[in-house]
């Protein structure tokens, strides 16, 4: 009954029912580790609701959706769907495809060195190495200059790859570092779900990067962990970068 009353899809619960029936001891252990909704209830209490967009932004988005509907009707349903869920549509934005991690990371580092107002980074993996060493110097220098620097990274994605000493160095110069869903807080449950797999960088609200590239040497093929690494991303310049 406990599993049945848990929030979630019935198909998800059915898998747990079958596992508990076939192997009760193993099923109970696995449910205790990964199956419950305790973390689902815990995380919302520690997150803040994203502020609503100003009305002017919403109005510009509606105008952009109307324009898109007329010019590219096939995309109108997608645009309207996103807007209904508070994802606004922006115009006046150029998009550059970056086919390799080395290209994206080089581009990101060069743009970060020119930041004047802020640098925001959110990544699943921030791994110490040549890429990080170069980026860290820029982030610390910019923080000393008064540029707002904020970093969010996933704790599980950085186990043994991003040290406490590095975090201390960043915080000493004014960089705000937030660790998403720290693993040590859930060691009794070993929750490996609810990770932050985003790879987003935003610089001054004018330039943004996203895609499949984390900040780690293997993504630039400086080191080889799993063979030649092929991942890509995009650079947005303009209103959409905000």
Identify the meaning behind each predicted range:
Residues 1-242:
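N-terminal localization/anchoring segments of enzymes in phospholipid and broader phosphate metabolism
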């Amino acid at each position: 009954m406990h599993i049945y009353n848990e929030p979630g899809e019935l198909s998800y619960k059915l898998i747990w029912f079958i596992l508990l029936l076939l192997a009760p001891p193993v099923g109970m252990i696995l449910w205790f580790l990964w199956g419950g909704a305790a973390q689902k209830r815990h995380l919302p209490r520690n997150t803040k609701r994203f502020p609503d967009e100003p009305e002017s932004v919403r109005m510009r988005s509606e105008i952009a959706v109307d324009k898109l509907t007329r010019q590219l009707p096939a995309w109108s349903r997608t645009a309207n769907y996103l807007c209904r869920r508070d994802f606004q549509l922006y115009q006046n934005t150029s998009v550059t495809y970056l086919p390799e991690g080395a290209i994206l990371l080089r581009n990101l580092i060069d743009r970060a060195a020119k930041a004047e107002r802020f640098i925001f980074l959110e990544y699943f993996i921030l791994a110490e190495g040549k890429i990080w060493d170069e980026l860290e110097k820029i982030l610390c220098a910019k923080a000393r200059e008064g540029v707002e620097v904020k970093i969010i990274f996933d704790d599980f994605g950085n186990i043994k790859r991003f040290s406490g000493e590095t975090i201390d160095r960043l915080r000493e110069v004014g960089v705000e570092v937030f660790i998403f869903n720290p693993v040590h807080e859930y060691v009794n449950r070993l929750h490996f779900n609810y990770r932050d797999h985003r790879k987003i960088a935003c610089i001054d609200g004018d330039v943004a990067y996203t895609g499949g590239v984390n900040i780690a040497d293997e993504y630039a093929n400086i080191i080889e962990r799993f063979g030649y690494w092929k991942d890509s991303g995009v650079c947005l310049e303009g209103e959409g970068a905000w």
